[in-house]
Amino acid sequence: MSWNDDDVFAGSANNDDVVLMDSWDAEEPIMESWDAEETPAKKETSPKPDSKKNAKKDSKKDKKSSTDQVLLEIDVLDEKTRKELLKKAELESDLNNAAELFGSLGVAEEHPRARALRKEQEVADAMRPAAFTKDTPIESHPLFNGESKKDYQDLRKALATAIVTMNEKSSLNYSSSLAIDLIRDVAKPMSIESIRQSIATLNVLMKDKEREERRARLAKVKGGTATGGAGKKKAKAKTNLGGAFKKDQEFDMGVDTYEDFGDDDFM
């Protein structure tokens, strides 16, 4: 064998060593000791989804679906109601966004729009008339806080309108238990001159009532007059014949007297 053959075998041996080393490296790593247990390879864990992000996405989806539902419902409404609902929905959305923003920032101050809305509601509640009961003192009504002449006139008109309607329920109780005693009680703080003026006013009212009652009474009687009184009737007019026929004139048509005529008159 020549030296060339040695070189050939040496080259092939080197190639075999390279192949063996590559295959050895490709196999599993050698354990440090025979007693060591095999540890399974750790699986690649996928990152857990963020629950907060999912919650925000779900809330946004819910808000979007609710908004779509509102839009579908208001499509059948008129233009004015639709604008009011859209404005209200926009305001609520702004308030919710502001509340979320302030909550995340730790700010507890009230939103300006919410404060303005609350003040408007308070003013509306204050302007709403309170419900009166039997236990409510009547002097607590704003009409009794009058100072000017017009305020007193408004109070008088309101009281007169409210009290006079009680006469329709019971005229007897109205006159005996309410009106007469009320006039006396109201006149107590007045001066003598003011009481005299009140009496004169009542006298004028009394005369007017007498005239009204007389007219009503005469209207029911046929032929009655305001001056002649009720029940008197007008005398019937007699026809004037000019004295041609009188009761005292006597006409004797039953006696035949022909003494004034002679026999020669009929010849």
UniProtKB/Swiss-Prot annotation:
Highest taxon above the source species: Eukaryota
Listed Basic and acidic residues bias regions: 39-66
The keyword Protein biosynthesis belongs to this UniProt entry's keyword annotation: yes
Gene3D superfamilies, alphabetized: Eukaryotic translation initiation factor 3 like domains
InterPro entries from the UniProt entry: eIF3-like_dom_sf, eIF3j
Keyword terms, alphabetized: Coiled coil, Cytoplasm, Initiation factor, Protein biosynthesis
GO biological process: formation of cytoplasmic translation initiation complex; maturation of SSU-rRNA from tricistronic rRNA transcript (SSU-rRNA, 5.8S rRNA, LSU-rRNA); nuclear-transcribed mRNA catabolic process, nonsense-mediated decay
Principal subcellular localisation of the protein: cytoplasm
Location within or outside the cell: Cytoplasm
Entry GO terms, CC: eukaryotic 43S preinitiation complex; eukaryotic 48S preinitiation complex; eukaryotic translation initiation factor 3 complex
Residue ranges of coiled coil: 192-220
Recorded GO MF terms: translation initiation factor activity
Region of interest called Disordered, as start-end residue ranges on this chain: 1-70
Composition-biased stretches (Acidic residues): 24-38
Lipoprotein listed as a keyword: no
Similarity annotation: Belongs to the eIF-3 subunit J family.
Subunit structure: Component of the eukaryotic translation initiation factor 3 (eIF-3) complex.
General function of this protein: Component of the eukaryotic translation initiation factor 3 (eIF-3) complex, which is involved in protein synthesis of a specialized repertoire of mRNAs and, together with other initiation factors, stimulates binding of mRNA and methionyl-tRNAi to the 40S ribosome. The eIF-3 complex specifically targets and initiates translation of a subset of mRNAs involved in cell proliferation.
Record-given protein name: Eukaryotic translation initiation factor 3 subunit J
Organism per entry: Vanderwaltozyma polyspora (strain ATCC 22028 / DSM 70294 / BCRC 21397 / CBS 2163 / NBRC 10782 / NRRL Y-8283 / UCD 57-17)
